[in-house]
Amino acid sequence: MKQENRQNQYAEFSMTISTSRELWRYLFRGQKNSSEKFTRVEAFHDLIERQYAALQQENDCIFGSISCLSRAWHWDRDTTSAFITDLEKFGVVSRYDIGKRAVLKLNCTIG
């Protein structure tokens, strides 16, 4: 009975965990996907690395296209677009389309 009450108590609970690029590198150390196709976690890590590279070049955003990300991740365009849309729904990424180019920005705190 206590376990059920505890589950109900946290049913609507939302939790945000702040992570760092270094943590992601640590988590992936020694991990190698046997397929060329990226997992969602690998694709998200790739976005973190792309955002970091953009910031190093003093850009706030990642410039590219869904096709470019699709090729890098070995996904089809629909899957890539749906993934970015899902990340938008989670509030993790902001997306702006300029013609056929996608401008992405991870909603991150720099410190």
Positions of predicted regions on the chain:
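Short recognition helix of helix-turn-helix/winged-helix DNA-binding domains
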Residues: 1-68
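Winged helix-turn-helix DNA-binding recognition segment
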Residues: 51-111
